[in-house]
Structure formats: C-alpha cells, structure tokens
C-alpha cells in the first residue's frame, strides 16, 4: 500500500478491520486536500484542532505531532483504526483525545476538519454540537470526494456555522469552507422516534442510527419469527442498531440475559435508552465494540443478527462474514445464530461453511431468515 504523504507526515496506514489482500487504502484525496489546506493556513503547537469522522485515523495521526488534536466519530472501528495507526507509526496513543459521537467534544477549537459522513443527519448533529465550542475566527472545513458530496452538506454548514464557499475540485475531492459566525443556539431534531405496532413499542433513534425514520424491511421480516419461550439463555443482538431485535426478543423471553453490541456509539446509546423505556431496570449489557471480538468464547447460547452489507460507501459481505465468524466463536456448543438477509447474498451457503447445521426458518420474495447451529 502507498504511504499517506502530506506536509505534516508520511504515514503507513491500514483500514479496520484488516483484510488479507486489502485492495482499498485507509485514506483518500479528500484527507490529503484537508491537510494541505490547513498547512497553507498555518498552525502552531498551540492550535486546537477537532477532527470529525476520520475513518481510519489518517487526519488525526498526521496532525498528532504538530497540534493539539481531538478526534470524534461514531465508529468504534474508526477508534480502533486510529489507535492501530498511531502505534504503527510510532506515535503516542495519548497524543489524540478521542470523543465518541454520542458525546460532545468540548473546545474551544481553532480549526475543525470534517469528513462528510454518508448520513447527513450525523453531520447535522455534529455541527449543532459545535455551537459554543469554536474559538473566535475559527474555520470549519468539510471535505469529501465529489461523487459522495451532497449539496445539502454545504447548506448545513451555512445554517449552523457561517458563510460557506466551495473550493475547486482537486483529485476529484472538494472542500466546503465555513467561517464561524454568530448563530442562535440551535435545537437538535435528534433523537427521532417512531411507533412499532407489533410488538407495540416506540423506537428511539439518535442521528446516525440505520433506518432512523422507520423500521428497515429486513428487521420487519425478522420480528415475527424471533425464537420465544427459550428460558434463561444468554443472547446477543449483534449489530444491534436501536436494539429492536434484542428488545423484542427480551419481551418474548423474560428470563433471557441480553447483550446488545454495535460498532456505532449512537446505536448503542439508542439501544440503551430504548431498553430502559421498554424494560425499565431489567439488567442488560450494552457495548460499542468490534462485533463480538470482545466476547468470551462459548459465552452465548443465541446470537441474533441483521448483518450490514456496507462500510461507509464500500459495499460487500466482508463485515457479515466477520460477524458470522465471531458468532461461531462466541456461541457455546449447541448454540444458534439467527440471521435475516437478502436472498441474493447467499448467506445459506456461507453459514454452511461455519456451522454444523443451517435451516431456513422463513422467507419472502426478498428476505430469508436462517438459523445456524454450532
């Protein structure tokens, strides 16, 4: 892989999770453009820089030796990538302060560098939280590859930060540059809520939760077929999102012990708050993690999963395959993985390579629900 070379550093970077023969870089031209623009403006060791949505740590690791860096994002995998890339390049792990997107990064900040996320609601929430955290004269610069940079991103900068102009495109990347100006205290529209008829629940969704405005069709297909009356099993909702699968299962199985895990901090926050609203003080474990990587081997009896098929703008089944491997390791003998997936993804064949037996529980023209026994 090529090195990431900018006026600040020359770094050897990897993506997270790592894959053998990884064809994709851990940085793009938008990262390079952001750092070149910041270098042209000039920074000192006293400059306070906030980096938002730094996918694999390219921006924060480049700046760490030169300024005071805070990094914030909604991906625990991104946090792990940052730590790995700092260590990989001989940089102090403490040189970058990391703040999960479920919390507010406290300034004041002189510069804010933003990689525009796929979910504009996340960008909006992040810009709202910058209110009161910017130093006088601060500049907020958002960047993305032109093909992934919506016009609405510039509108959000104008609304919440100040006057904005777009740069020329360089290597198919563009900057949106906003100068901080007086703005009234904004009111966040997040979290959002919607009502589920069966089971009768009101779902809570922070800004970056998948299908924030309504239940996704895969989960809708899965819910009527959740296992029930299984007793005190140790169950996990893997990639839990707002926690709807785990909470619906918990309602059907009052003795079950639940763990809800997602790599999104906002998803875990949503699941925790939703659980308390639906189930009160019933104990459960909530964790932002790299799937079940932190789960002890053989410590679960059941895993429920609606696996993702994309990481940022990259589409593929590598994350689902990794989740299946993690579930197999975390399940005790006789335990089961239950999943929902698009028919065309061929999960049945993949699961047969990992599990003792695979059965179809239900299907419709678009989705299939499978259970795989260890």
Can you say where each PLM-predicted feature lies in the sequence?
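Class I S-adenosyl-L-methionine
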Residues: 159-199, 209, 342-374
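Conserved SAM/SAH cofactor-binding pocket of Class I
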Residues: 30-90, 94-95, 217-305
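Conserved beta-strand signature within the Rossmann-like core of class I S-adenosyl-L-methionine
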Residues: 137-145, 334-341
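SAM-dependent Rossmann-like transferase core, predominantly class I methyltransferases
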Residues: 19, 24-28, 33-40, 169-233
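Short beta->alpha hinge that forms the Motif I/post-I loop of the SAM-binding pocket
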Residues: 73-77, 145, 262-267, 319, ...
């Amino acid at each position: 892989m090529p090195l990431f070379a900018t006026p600040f550093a020359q770094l050897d970077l990897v993506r997270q999770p790592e894959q053998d023969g990884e064809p994709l870089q851990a940085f793009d031209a938008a990262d390079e453009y952001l750092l070149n623009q910041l270098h042209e403006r000039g920074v000192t060791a006293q400059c306070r820089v906030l980096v938002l949505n730094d996918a694999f740590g390219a921006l924060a690791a480049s700046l760490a030796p030169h300024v005071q860096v805070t990094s914030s994002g909604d991906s625990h995998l991104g946090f792990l990538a940052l730590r790995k890339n700092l260590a990989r390049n001989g940089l102090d792990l403490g040189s970058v302060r990391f703040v999960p997107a479920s919390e507010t990064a406290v300034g004041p900040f002189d510069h804010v560098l933003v990689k525009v996320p796929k979910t504009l609601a996340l960008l909006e929430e992040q810009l709202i939280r910058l209110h009161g955290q910017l130093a006088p004269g601060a500049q907020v610069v958002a960047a993305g590859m032109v093909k992934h940079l919506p016009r609405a991103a510039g509108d959000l900068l104008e609304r919440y930060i100040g006057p904005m102009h777009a740069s020329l495109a360089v290597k198919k990347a563009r900057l949106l540059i906003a100068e901080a100006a007086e703005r009234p205290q904004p009111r966040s529209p997040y979290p959002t809520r919607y009502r589920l008829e069966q089971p009768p629940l009101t779902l809570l969704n922070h800004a970056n939760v998948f299908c924030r405005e309504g239940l996704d069709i895969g989960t809708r297909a899965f819910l009527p077929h959740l296992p029930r009356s299984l007793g005190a099993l140790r169950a996990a909702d893997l990639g839990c999102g707002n926690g709807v699968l785990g909470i619906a299962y918990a309602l059907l199985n009052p003795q079950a012990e639940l763990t809800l895990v997602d790599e999104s901090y906002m998803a875990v926050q949503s699941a925790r708050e939703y659980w308390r609203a639906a189930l009160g003080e019933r104990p459960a474990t909530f964790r932002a993690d790299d799937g079940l990587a932190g789960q002890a081997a053989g410590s679960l009896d059941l895993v429920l999963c609606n696996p993702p098929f994309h990481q940022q703008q990259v589409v593929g089944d590598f994350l689902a395959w990794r989740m299946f491997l993690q579930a197999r390791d975390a399940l005790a003998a006789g335990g089961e993985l239950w999943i929902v997936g698009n028919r065309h993804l061929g999960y049945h064949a993949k699961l047969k390579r990992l599990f003792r037996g695979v059965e179809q529980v239900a299907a419709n023209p678009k989705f299939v629900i499978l259970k795989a026994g260890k």
